[in-house]
Each structure stands twice: as C-alpha cells, then as structure tokens.
C-alpha cells in the first residue's frame, strides 16, 4: 500500500469511513455482480465465526439445541399464517424452475423460518413431556430488499441466528423473551462492548404474526439507529395456524405458546466495526479479533537474525497460551507494517529489547505503548485484552449516552433531528391508535418511533400531551432515524 495511514475522519464522514474500511481492511468485496449479495473475505468471516461461537454457546448453555432446516419453504407453508405472509410477500425470492421444468408449486428462499420449523413442530410435539422445545439454527436468509443495500447492514442475503421456542404456558413463553434479552446483554454488550436499548416496538412495527415484538437498537457513529437483535412473543398465532398441540396432564389437547428470537450476526459485526473503529482503522474486542497479537520485529542489518529469533520465541509463548498470533517478517518498512496492522485492528508486540528480555506492546485502542518482561508476556497480553474490551465498552456507552435527547414539541424534535441519536418524547400510544402519528413523524422528519424502553420505563404525567396529535400522552417513546 502506498499510503502510510488509513486516516479517514469517522466522525465527519462515517459513510466514507465505513465503505473504505470494509474494502481496505479486506472484510468485504461488494463487487460480486448481483445487487445486495456480497463476498465475505477471511478477516470478516473469522470474526463472524467468533461471534457465532459466542452466541451459540450462550444459547446452548440455556437449553437450546442446534438444528439446520432446508433453505427452501413450500409456498403452501408460507401462506398458512396470513399476517405473517403479508409482512414478507414483497420480499420473497421465488424458485419457479428446476432445470427447464416449471415447478408445480413455487418454493421460497427462506426470508425467515417460522413456516419451515412449525410444520415439523406439529409432528414432533405430542404431549406435555415434549415441552419446552428450544431449537436454533445459524444460517443465511434471503430477502428481496428494495431499499439501498449496504454491506453488513442491509442486504438481500444476510447471516443471523434464529431460535424457535415452544411452551405450554404464556408465562413460560414470556420468560423466554426475557431470557433472549439477557443473552443479548451478555454477548453484544458485555463481551463485544456494544451498548443498546431494548424496546417494545409499536404494534404497527412489530414482527408480522407476533403478538409483541421487543428489539435491541444501537447507535451508529452517524447517529442513525441500527436494530441488531429482536425477540417476539408469538402467543398462539402460529400454533393455531399449524396445529401445534400437546396433550396436557388431564388428557386435553391444547395449543402451545411460542417465541422466536433473531440475533442479527451480520449487523452485530457492522456495529462492532463501526462503533469501536477509529480514524486509523479497525479496533476490535480481543475475543473476536482474527489475530489477537502481531509481533513486529524491527531489526537492523546487524541484529536481524537475533531479533527474529527472539520474535519467534515471543510468538511461541503466546501461541502456546492459546492466543491467535502472527509475526510480520516481511520486507516492508516499519511504517508500512505499523499502518497495515493498525488498520486491521491488531495490537502489536515489538521485541526490540533482546538484551533486556522484555517487549514493547502497542495497545490498538489507546495507541499507547507499554513494556512487559518476556516471562510475563502472556499474562500481560491477556490482561490488556480485558482492559481493551472494558475501554471500548466504556467509550461506546459514553457516546450513546451523549446522543439521547428530550423534546416536548414538534419544533424541538425538528431541531434535534438534525443531530441524530435518540429523541425521547411524550406520545399518545404504541398501539394501532398511535400509528397515524408515527407515520406523520416518518413522513415529515424521517423519524421512526422505535418504541418504549423496557428498562426505566416511565409513564408521562397526567397533563403530558402527544407532540404530534395533542392527545393525552400514554408513553414516553424514543424516536430515531434508522438504517
């Protein structure tokens, strides 16, 4: 590379920063010649696999089992739950031919898999002893996206996890919804450092076929909102459509209660890249970094052999401790090496001090150097990995908290909407009777009602009025401009 630094101002031009980092850090190639479909290169795919590993482990520790269902869904299945299919009809990719033969019935590439799972659940579930049933699959889904596509944020094929859970009672189903939120907190916030707010979505913006939808929104550097996970209480809507029933202890057949959960693995990676990155490139949580440490020897001609041998000793010590390590023995200049590995988000170790038996470590998050004795290199690197995550999480929380505003009138909302972020306002209702007010905000200001926060939910005072229609305010809602 001819440039010595990545050097794109993320704060001033996030769109350019994002488009360049995914290409120059070799995360994504979007030149594949089908709109909305991208090539995941090794650096991004390695991170995606790490996120999948963490998320799948969290699900399985809570009783979920992995499965894999077919990519295609028969048209008859898709049309069994009317509200559900209406929500996805315009986004479905249809298979109409097998070779030169037209199929008798069309097959859908899964836009989501409720209608693939639930016919099988109707066969598998017979009695109370079959419940609860908690299954998940890690897969790609396909949606004929008509909005502008953006790699890792909005595409026609994207990666996620979907969990489909079945219970005997409504109470158990709602407990699962709460557990889904806990998993998101553990993985996305605690282990990846991305803060978010879980909202109850307005009825007009819920998952089609659900009774209620709860979704996690984070804030991107440009102040736009990105949904990164959602969980849905389905009630008995799908169990009645697909006749999923069990025999209770009294010998009565009853419809089950269901939930579904969709962590957006693609979008979680987009959030990690965007929120933690800086003007010099990627800054990654230690746990998902493809390379956790790079050893960069900077020898003179006279010390080349001894410095490189010392570097290999450092590499061996770190690898034997289970860390992902590389050494850069290339002929690039020191500046070119530092530029490349900094852009890729990798902390550096420079074994310059052979005689003193210590190494210099460069922290990618703070861009500061610290020294460590060779015998303590493993302990020091692991400790720094924890500190990097804590620092990234703290920085991200500070940013999000600084981007939450309050308004009591449309004039204030209009002014604040230029800043991005969340705007808290008194609002009439998140039921269908509030839909027209929500549509007006979208039409006039490009703002969406994201919903009511599930933590610290506060009811407006008696005299509070909806900023749009002037009726009595039933809720404080968060507004935002979304991807």
Where do the model's predicted regions map?
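NTP/phosphate- and nucleic-acid-binding module
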Residues: 1-483
């Amino acid at each position: 590379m001819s440039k010595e630094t990545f050097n794109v101002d993320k704060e001033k031009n996030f769109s350019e920063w994002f488009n360049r980092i995914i290409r120059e850090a070799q995360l994504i190639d979007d030149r594949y010649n089908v709109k909305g479909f991208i090539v995941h290169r090794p650096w991004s795919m390695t991170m995606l696999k790490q996120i999948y590993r963490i998320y799948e482990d969290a699900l399985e520790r809570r009783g979920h089992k992995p499965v894999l269902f077919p990519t295609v869904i028969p048209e008859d299945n898709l049309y069994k739950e009317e509200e559900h299919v209406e929500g996805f009809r315009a986004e479905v990719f249809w298979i109409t031919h097998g070779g030169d033969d037209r199929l008798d019935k069309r097959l859908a590439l899964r836009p989501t898999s409720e209608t693939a799972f639930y016919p099988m659940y109707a066969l598998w579930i017979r009695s109370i002893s079959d419940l609860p049933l908690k299954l998940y699959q890690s897969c790609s889904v396909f949606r004929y996206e008509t909005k502008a596509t953006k790699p890792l944020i909005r595409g026609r094929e994207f990666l996620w996890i979907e969990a489909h859970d079945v219970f005997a009672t409504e109470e158990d189903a709602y407990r699962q919804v709460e557990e889904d939120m806990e998993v998101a907190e553990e993985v996305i916030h605690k282990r990846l450092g991305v803060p978010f707010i879980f909202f109850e979505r307005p009825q007009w913006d819920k998952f089609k076929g659900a009774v209620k939808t709860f979704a996690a929104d984070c804030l991107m550097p440009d102040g736009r909102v990105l949904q990164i996970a959602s969980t849905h209480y389905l009630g008995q809507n799908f169990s009645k459509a697909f006749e999923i029933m069990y025999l209770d202890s009294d010998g009565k057949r009853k419809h089950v209660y269901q939930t579904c959960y969709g962590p957006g693995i693609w979008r979680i990676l987009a959030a990690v890249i965007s929120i933690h990155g800086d003007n010099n490139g990627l800054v990654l949580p230690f746990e998902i970094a493809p390379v956790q440490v790079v050893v960069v020897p900077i020898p003179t001609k006279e010390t080349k052999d001894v410095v490189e041998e010392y570097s290999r000793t450092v590499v061996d010590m770190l690898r034997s401790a289970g860390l992902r390590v590389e050494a850069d023995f290339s002929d690039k200049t020191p500046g070119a090496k530092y530029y490349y590995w900094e852009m890729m988000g990798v902390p550096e170790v420079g074994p310059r001090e052979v005689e003193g038996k210590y190494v210099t470590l460069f922290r990618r998050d703070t861009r500061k150097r610290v020294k460590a004795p060779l015998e303590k290199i493993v302990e020091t690197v692991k400790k720094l990995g924890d500190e990097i995550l804590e620092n990234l999480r703290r920085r991200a929380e500070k940013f999000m908290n600084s981007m939450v505003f309050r308004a009591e009138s449309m004039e204030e909302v209009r002014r604040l909407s230029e800043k991005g972020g969340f705007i808290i306002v008194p609002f009439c209702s998140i039921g269908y009777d509030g839909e027209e007010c929500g549509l007006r905000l979208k039409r006039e200001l490009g703002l969406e009602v994201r919903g009511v926060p599930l933590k610290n939910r506060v009811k407006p005072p008696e005299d509070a009025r909806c900023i749009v229609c002037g009726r009595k305010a039933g809720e404080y809602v968060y507004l935002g401009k979304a991807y």
